[in-house]
C-alpha cells in the first residue's frame, strides 16, 4: 500500500539546534516540553531528540521528580 499525502518531515534534535550541551534538572519549563500531559517522558520518535540528549533528558526529568519540581503523574479529572 502506497503512502499518501505529504512525506513526513525529519525531526531535528532541539538541544543540538539550540546548542545546549547539558540539560539542567532545575529548568522545569524546558523539561515540561518533553513530558506528556499524563506525566510520561515522551520517546525519541515523537520528540526527535538524539540518543545522547534523550539519556540526559530522562535523567534530568527523574531528578526533577525526586525533588518535587515535576510531578510523577498528573490528575486531569
UniProtKB/Swiss-Prot annotation:
One Gene Ontology cellular component: cytosolic small ribosomal subunit
Pfam families reported for this sequence: Ribosomal_S18 (PF01084)
InterPro entries: Ribosomal_bS18, Ribosomal_bS18_CS, Ribosomal_bS18_sf
Highest taxon listed in the record's lineage: Bacteria
BP terms from Gene Ontology: translation
Keywords: Ribonucleoprotein, Ribosomal protein, RNA-binding, rRNA-binding
GO molecular function: small ribosomal subunit rRNA binding; structural constituent of ribosome
Function, as annotated: Binds as a heterodimer with protein bS6 to the central domain of the 16S rRNA, where it helps stabilize the platform of the 30S subunit.
Assembly: Part of the 30S ribosomal subunit. Forms a tight heterodimer with protein bS6.
Entry-linked PANTHER family: 30S RIBOSOMAL PROTEIN S18 (PTHR13479), SMALL RIBOSOMAL SUBUNIT PROTEIN BS18M (PTHR13479:SF40)
Similarity section: Belongs to the bacterial ribosomal protein bS18 family.
Listed name of the protein: Small ribosomal subunit protein bS18
Source organism of the structure: Halalkalibacterium halodurans (strain ATCC BAA-125 / DSM 18197 / FERM 7344 / JCM 9153 / C-125) (Bacillus halodurans)
